[in-house]
C-alpha cells in the first residue's frame, strides 16, 4: 500500500475526532501524513458547510455558536491545545529556555485561558455579525490553514522536543502542500469572490513565523497555534468582507 494512502489515513486518525475508517500506521509515511493535512481540511470544511446549512434554521446566537465551535468539535479540540500552550509560553515574556519549558507544561495558565476566551468571543461574534457566508470560502478555510501549517512543519527547523525533529525536510510532500495552498486560496476567489481562504493563509503564515521566532523552532503546538489564528482571520474576513 502506498505511503500516500497510509499518510491520509494516519492524518485522519490523528487530526480528526471522526472515527477513522482504516486505522493503519507506517513510520515512513509520517511526512505524507503532514502533506495530507489539506485533505483533512476538506473533511473539516465539508462539516462546516453542513453546519452552515443547518444554522439557517436556528436563532442567530445559536447559529453563531454552532459555526464557531464546529471546526473545534470535528478535530476534538486538538489544535486549541497547541494554541493555548503557545499563548502561555509566549505571553510569559520569559527567557527562551523558560518559554520552551512552559510550552511543554501540561498545566493551563492564565494567559491560555484569556486567549481562549478572546478567540471564542471573536469567532462567535464574527459569525453572529455576518449577513451572509460564502460557502466556498467557508469550505476552503480549513484547507488553506492546514496547507500552511503543513508547509511550516515540513520546511522550518523543528524544536528538539518536537515529534517531527528527526523528520526529513523538503521533497514531494512540500510541493503537494504548496499546490493545495495555492488552489485553496485561488479557487474561492475565482468561483465566489471570497478572499477568506487567502487571508487565512496570510494569518496562518504570520502566526507560524511569530511562534517560530519566539520559541526558536517549529513544533506541533506552534502549528496548531498558527492554524487556529489563521482560521480566525478567515472567519473575520467572511464576516466583514466575503
Residue ranges of each PLM-predicted region?
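Multi-pass membrane catalytic core of lipid/isoprenoid biosynthesis enzymes
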Residues: 30-48, 89-133, 137-138, 175-189, ...
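Solvent-exposed interhelical
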Residues: 92, 147-181, 215-218
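Alpha-helical transmembrane segments and their lipid-water interface positions
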Residues: 17, 21, 79, 88, ...
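Acidic (Asp/Glu-rich) catalytic motifs at the cytosolic membrane interface
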Residues: 70-108, 211-230
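Membrane-embedded alpha-helical segments that form the functional core of polytopic membrane enzymes
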Residues: 35-87, 136-140, 194-213
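Membrane-proximal soluble regions of multi-pass membrane proteins
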Residues: 1-25
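C-terminal ends of transmembrane helices
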Residues: 19-25, 78, 97-98, 150-160, ...
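N-terminal beta-alpha supersecondary unit
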Residues: 7-13, 27-52, 166-170
Amino acid at each position: 500500500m502506498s505511503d500516500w494512502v497510509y499518510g491520509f489515513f494516519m492524518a485522519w486518525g490523528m487530526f480528526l475526532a471522526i472515527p477513522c475508517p482504516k486505522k493503519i500506521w507506517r513510520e515512513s509515511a509520517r511526512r505524507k501524513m503532514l502533506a495530507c493535512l489539506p485533505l483533512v481540511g476538506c473533511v473539516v470544511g465539508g462539516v462546516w458547510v453542513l453546519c452552515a446549512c443547518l444554522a439557517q434554521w436556528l436563532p442567530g446566537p445559536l447559529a453563531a455558536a454552532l459555526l464557531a465551535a464546529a471546526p473545534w468539535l470535528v478535530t476534538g479540540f486538538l489544535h486549541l491545545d497547541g494554541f493555548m500552550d503557545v499563548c502561555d509560553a509566549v505571553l510569559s515574556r520569559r527567557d527562551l529556555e523558560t518559554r520552551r519549558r512552559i510550552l511543554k507544561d501540561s498545566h493551563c495558565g492564565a494567559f491560555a485561558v484569556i486567549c481562549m476566551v478572546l478567540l471564542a468571543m471573536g469567532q462567535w461574534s464574527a459569525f453572529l455579525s455576518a449577513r451572509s457566508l460564502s460557502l466556498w470560502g467557508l469550505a476552503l478555510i480549513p484547507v488553506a490553514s492546514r496547507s500552511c501549517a503543513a508547509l511550516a512543519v515540513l520546511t522550518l527547523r523543528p524544536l528538539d522536543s518536537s515529534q517531527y525533529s528527526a523528520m526529513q525536510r523538503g521533497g514531494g510532500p512540500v510541493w503537494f502542500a504548496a499546490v493545495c495552498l495555492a488552489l485553496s486560496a485561488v479557487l474561492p476567489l475565482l468561483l465566489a469572490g471570497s478572499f477568506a481562504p487567502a487571508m487565512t493563509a496570510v494569518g496562518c503564515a504570520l502566526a507560524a513565523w511569530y511562534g517560530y521566532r519566539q520559541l526558536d523552532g517549529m513544533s506541533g503546538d506552534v502549528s496548531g497555534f498558527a492554524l487556529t489564528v489563521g482560521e480566525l482571520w478567515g472567519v473575520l474576513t467572511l464576516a466583514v468582507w466575503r
